[in-house]
């Protein structure tokens, strides 16, 4: 991240949907970057735990949150989410919403599954291999893999989006997003 003001603070449609689907509670924003989802949720009354490996990204988020008068609803941690042993632990039944947008680290899925409280939401938006291409990159899922995994958990899919981003399609990627609710 550059040290300038964060750009692109518009949340993904899946986050916008989730914020209106349940009453505000405690949210976990994994790999929050410069905080577009953290700030969006905090402005809507959520208490947000924001985690990212970049101190620069966290600092940009905090400055923007201060300017938007929602800093008091944000806890932040500079932690490597891929570290072994884990630098940040997702507490079981600890969150009303967990967001994982454009950060794929497969070992987190189990912790996400059990970290969402009953009745709570998982918001996932991840890159997937484009039609007809295989999954050669470790940060890309196969098409339908995210939805299939969450359905295997027994969760209800409330929102689903498949987006072929023509800019990313050149790289053989598109995006899939969902909002899923853990059974109460």
Where are these regions (language model features)?
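Conserved class I S-adenosyl-L-methionine
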Residues: 25-33
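S-adenosyl-L-methionine
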Residues: 1-22
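Conserved SAM/SAH-binding beta-strand->alpha-helix loop
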Residues: 54-56
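A short acidic, Gly/Pro-enriched loop at the edge of an enzyme's catalytic core
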Residues: 87-97
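Conserved SAM-binding motif I beta-strand of class I
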Residues: 47-52
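A short glycine-rich, Lys/Arg-flanked "PGG" loop and its adjoining helix->strand segment in the class I
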Residues: 109-120
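Conserved beta-strand signature within the Rossmann-like core of class I S-adenosyl-L-methionine
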Residues: 120-129
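Conserved SAM-binding strand-loop segment of SAM-dependent methyltransferases
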Residues: 70-83
């Amino acid at each position: 991240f550059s040290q300038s003001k964060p750009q692109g603070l518009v949340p993904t449609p899946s986050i916008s949907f989730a914020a209106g689907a349940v009453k505000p509670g405690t949210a976990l924003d994994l790999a929050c970057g410069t905080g577009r989802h953290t700030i969006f949720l905090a402005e809507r009354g959520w208490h947000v735990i924001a985690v990212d490996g970049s101190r620069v990204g966290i600092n940009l988020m905090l400055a923007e949150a201060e300017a938007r008068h929602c800093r008091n609803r944000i806890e932040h941690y500079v932690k490597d989410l891929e570290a072994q042993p884990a630098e940040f632990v997702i507490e079981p039944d600890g969150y009303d919403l967990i967001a994982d947008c454009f950060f794929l680290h497969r070992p987190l899925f189990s912790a996400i599954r059990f970290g969402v409280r009953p009745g709570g939401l998982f918001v996932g938006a991840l890159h997937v291999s484009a039609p007809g291409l295989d999954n050669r990159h470790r940060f890309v899922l196969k098409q339908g893999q995210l939805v299939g995994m969450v359905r295997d958990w027994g969760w209800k899919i409330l929102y689903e989006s498949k987006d072929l981003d023509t800019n990313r399609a050149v790289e053989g990627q598109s995006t899939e997003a969902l909002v899923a609710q853990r059974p109460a």
